[in-house]
Amino acid sequence: MKKVALGKIIENTVESKYKSNSVSSSLSTGASAKLSLSEYYKTFEANKVGQHTTYDVVGKRDYTKFDKLVKKY
């Protein structure tokens, strides 16, 4: 079995999910509708109405590191 770092698995998962979501959203709403990953997660948090969330409990979340991961897409 090939050893793979956990960080690489997470990075690949995030990239594949983000890429598939941005492709499906661009097909349904137009090519200019691609959100940055931080905007995607902020929208996701806003849509979780009625669920417990840790957003803004210990400060605003910073998604710039995730944006840098998927900058090539």
UniProtKB/Swiss-Prot annotation:
InterPro entries in the cross-refs: DUF5470
The organism's place on the tree of life at top rank: Viruses
Record protein name field: Uncharacterized 8.2 kDa protein in LEF8-FP intergenic region
Source organism of the structure: Autographa californica nuclear polyhedrosis virus
Higher taxonomy: Viruses, Viruses incertae sedis, Naldaviricetes, Lefavirales, Baculoviridae
